[in-house]
Regions:
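PLP-dependent enzyme catalytic core of the Aspartate aminotransferase-like
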Residues: 54, 58-62, 66, 88, ...
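Conserved N-terminal alpha-helix of the aminotransferase class I/II PLP-enzyme fold
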Residues: 58-104
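Conserved PLP-anchoring active-site segment centered on the Schiff-base-forming lysine
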Residues: 114-130
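Active-site phosphate-binding strand-loop segment of PLP-dependent enzymes
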Residues: 147-204
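A conserved beta-strand-loop-helix scaffold within acyl/acetyltransferase catalytic domains
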Residues: 426-517, 567-568, 576-734
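Acyl-donor binding region in acyl/amide transferases
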Residues: 480-482, 488, 494-495, 501-599, ...
Length: 797
């Protein structure tokens, strides 16, 4: 995640969109200069434009003259008297105990670990601000359960409350009043109803973007919609509309106020707001309580109304139309958003982006804010310009209004008189594409020539899997295996791919401890954290799943076309994730830039463990090629115990033998947390038992058991020995080192059969190195089309 985010941000920095500095000697309006160029700034959250208020600036000067630039003492020991004046003024506005903090984020970090106690439970809205999500991690460290609901889904919230109320002391719902990405509102009337109906429900709500511009005396959106409930803590900002510094926590009673002030970590260990900005805060609070303040709000309300009206007239879309000053225009992938922002900059307008990871990868957009420093004419001209640049930018990136409508599931938009015809380069002029629903439609020799040396996605395997994974009772055992080939005008294959639409576990590649927790939760809900995925290859096969002819001059266009096809199929099939696999490091380097622009992020897959040097003559020769560490391990852990085992190479024939082999596999599957996949059906094993390309190795303990204690199921493909599945009896596995022993016997078997290479598949790197395997870097590229499962898994960490 961090590496992918770094690449996305750095791309935007390199394109001159992010991490810029103003070059103004003085800023006195909504205009800013960046690199010497003037822009009208629509990226400011100072909604009422009070940063240029003479009253506030004079207060800053006076406070500085009286108290200096800082008063550097923890509030636990001593606060400058301006704090008391500011908190008293805020109390008059809100009629609730007010605790001023150095920032809204520091307020969350101070309050939440004190308010949320042992036995409580937290429910987060999916879109709640990052600062609350970060603070929730502290609660998780204190063993507080964290749950997440879809954005503004009150039915899901009530369902969670009913589920948790018997065991929880308190249930804390955490939300925003005005959400910072989409500018939409929390459904406060419904939340208030739930607070009244469920005694254990409590509300912690951040109204940073609602403060000032609305509500009586500017007390914000939340308090404009409901009274301060006696089970509600309100956090808001003294930045943004308030134009000062810091945050404020509003409590329903003095006891909560006292406890957070006494015990909140950032109240003790963080620095205070400094005198100049305390002066600004006091002046702003006085202004909020003045007769003229309502005029500022009314003026701003007219601008919000005008902006919504103008967007509608121009046919520009909004994800959620509200009366907030924060607007989100749906676009799509990050590269599309950046294209439009760059175009708007060239026209003299500075807008923000909203994208991954705050939104799903394909659901980024333009984010702009209006404020009282803007005139109606400023807003009108910016939106008129945006209408044109929005469409041109979409088309330049291969998108369209229709695509945005489909992706965001919003109503069709754009004034028909403005709609432009675009002339895209048609792919059929450079290659032909074939979408196939069965491997039977593809010549086996041609297909295997591309794939047989690189894993198990070979013709005969795919033919079997098509038969096995259809018409089954279990959802996870019904796969749609499809094929996509792209040929140039001479008929040569430029790209060939097999891909599968299947129900998969969302923790497929999650860390072991997290997968272990999820595995426990699946004992109650078998399909917990599962979703429909598209992955290249199949959930059973491994190795190369996309062939690309990098020598063909059109390979990049072919790859883009393939990804676009997968994304279209994902949209039509309610797919949550797309995973392209498996690529070596050189391949990854060639394609990562293209795929990142298409919204797919690099994923480090488990190493592939391969014995590719088969020139050794005997065990001593094999051992001589290992490092000293692994020579010792092979001798002491494996060869020393080899005499305890009988080894048989046979195909399971009788029903009992076949079923027992399956049981040994199930033992391993039930213990595995490194790669989370569904248990394979017995139906597949029956195909394997009958397939002459499969080789079976059984281990028996000479003195301990009449039944095999381990089995390795491998497939020989084009003289490569592919270890597919292992089975173990855990009554003996650890004591006798059965897994290590069967790995060694697998290597010996492949050598005996004259195979040129052994593919020992993924995981258990250390054990496989002991028998001569070398780890090969293995990469994938993934796109999460929705955030829900990712956020849910984060809450379980």
């Amino acid at each position: 995640m961090i590496n992918s985010l770094d690449k996305i941000i750095q791309d935007a920095v390199d394109r001159g969109v992010l991490q810029k500095l103003t070059s103004d000697e003085q800023i006195i309006s909504s205009e800013v200069h960046i690199d010497g160029i003037k822009y009208l700034n629509f990226g400011s959250c100072s909604y009422l434009g009070l940063e240029h208020s003479k009253l506030l600036k004079e207060a800053v000067k006076n406070a500085t003259e009286k108290y200096g630039t800082q008063f550097s003492t923890s509030r636990t020991y001593l606060s400058i008297g301006l704090y008391e004046e500011l908190e008293s003024s805020l109390y008059k506005m809100f009629q609730k105990p007010a605790l001023v903090t150095a920032s809204t984020t520091l307020g969350h970090l101070s309050a939440l670990p004190i308010l949320v106690e042992e036995g409580d439970v937290v429910i987060l809205d999916l879109q709640v601000h990052s600062s609350i999500q970060m603070s929730a991690q502290l609660l998780k460290a204190n063993k507080i359960p964290i749950h997440i609901i879809p954005h503004n889904d009150m039915a899901a919230l009530e369902k969670k409350i009913k589920l948790l109320q018997e065991k929880a002391n308190k249930i804390w719902y955490m939300a925003d009043g005005v959400y910072s990405m989409y500018g939409d509102f929390a459904p406060l009337k419904k939340i208030q109803s739930l607070l009244n109906r469920y005694k254990k429900l409590h509300l912690y709500i951040d109204d940073a973007h609602g403060m000032g511009w609305t509500g009586d005396q500017g007390i914000g959106y939340v308090r404009s919609q409901m009274e301060h409930h006696d089970k509600m803590i309100l956090a808001t900002s003294l930045n943004k509309s308030f134009a000062a510094s810091g945050g404020v926590l509003l409590f329903p009673n003095k006891e909560m106020y006292r406890k957070v002030k006494n015990c909140g970590s950032t109240m003790i260990f963080s620095g205070p707001i400094q005198p100049p900005m305390l002066g600004a805060g006091i002046a702003s609070a006085k202004l909020h309580q003045s007769d003229e303040f309502k005029d500022l709000q009314d003026e701003f309300e007219q601008k919000i109304t005008f902006t919504n009206h103008k967007l509608s007239v121009l046919g520009l879309p909004q994800y959620a139309r509200t009366n907030s000053p924060l607007f989100f225009i749906p676009v799509g992938l990050p590269t599309m958003v950046l294209n439009i922002i760059e175009r708007m900059k060239r026209k003299g307008y500075y807008l923000n982006s909203a994208g991954f990871p705050a939104t799903p990868m394909k659901k980024g957009g333009l984010r702009f804010m209006i404020n009282n420093n803007h005139t109606i004419e400023d807003i009108d001209q910016m939106l008129t310009t945006l209408q044109q640049e929005y469409i041109v930018g979409l088309h330049a990136e291969g998108s369209s209004p229709e695509e945005v409508t489909k992706q965001f599931k919003i109503a069709p938009f754009i004034n028909p008189t403005f709609k432009k015809q675009i002339h895209k380069k048609e792919n059929w002029q450079i290659f032909k594409e074939y979408q196939l629903s069965s491997i039977k439609e593809i010549d086996s020799e041609e297909w295997n020539a591309l794939f047989s040396k690189h894993g198990s996605n070979v013709h005969q395997n795919l033919k079997q899997l098509e038969q096995v994974f259809k018409g089954n009772k279990e959802l996870e055992n019904n796969w749609e295996i499809k094929y996509h080939t792209i040929r140039d005008t001479e008929g040569n294959i430029v790209l060939a791919s097999v891909y599968t639409i299947a129900l998969m576990m969302d923790d497929l590649l999650a860390e072991k401890t997290l997968s272990g927790k999820i595995k426990e939760l699946r004992k109650k809900d078998r399909l917990y954290l599962t979703s429909k995925n598209i992955l290249t290859g199949t959930p059973f096969t491994k190795g190369k799943s996309i062939y690309i002819d990098y020598e063909n001059k059109h390979w990049k266009e072919a790859l883009k076309s393939h990804v676009n096809l997968l994304q279209d199929i994902a949209d039509k099939n309610n797919v949550s994730n797309i995973l392209l696999r498996e690529f070596c490091r050189d391949q990854k380097t060639s394609i990562e830039g293209i795929l990142m622009n298409l919204g797919l992020l690099e994923v480090q897959l488990p190493h592939n463990l391969v014995v590719d040097d088969m020139t050794w003559e005997n065990t001593n020769d094999l051992m001589s090629r290992l490092s000293q560490k692994y020579r010792y391990s092979l001798r002491k852990e494996i060869l020393k115990r080899e005499g305890q085992f009988e080894v048989e190479f046979k195909r399971p024939t009788g029903k009992h033998e076949q079923e027992y082999t399956f049981e040994l596999y199930k033992n391993v599957h039930s213990q595995s947390t490194e790669i989370s996949v569904f248990e394979l059906p017995y139906k597949l094993f029956q195909k394997m038992y009958a397939d002459p390309s499969y080789d079976f190795i059984y281990l028996y303990l000479k003195e301990a058991s009449e039944k095999p204690v381990a089995v390795m199921m491998s497939q020989i493909i084009d003289n490569i020995y592919n270890a597919q599945l292992v089975g173990l009896d855990y009554n003996y596995a650890r004591e006798y080192g059965c897994y290590k022993q069967i790995l060694y016997q697998t290597v010996k078997r492949a050598k005996y059969l004259g195979c040129e290479k052994i593919d020992l598949a993924y995981t258990a790197d250390m054990e496989k190195k002991k028998v001569g395997a070398k780890p090969k870097d293995n990469f994938g590229f993934a796109m999460a089309l929705e955030h829900d499962s990712y956020v849910e898994m984060q809450s379980l960490k």
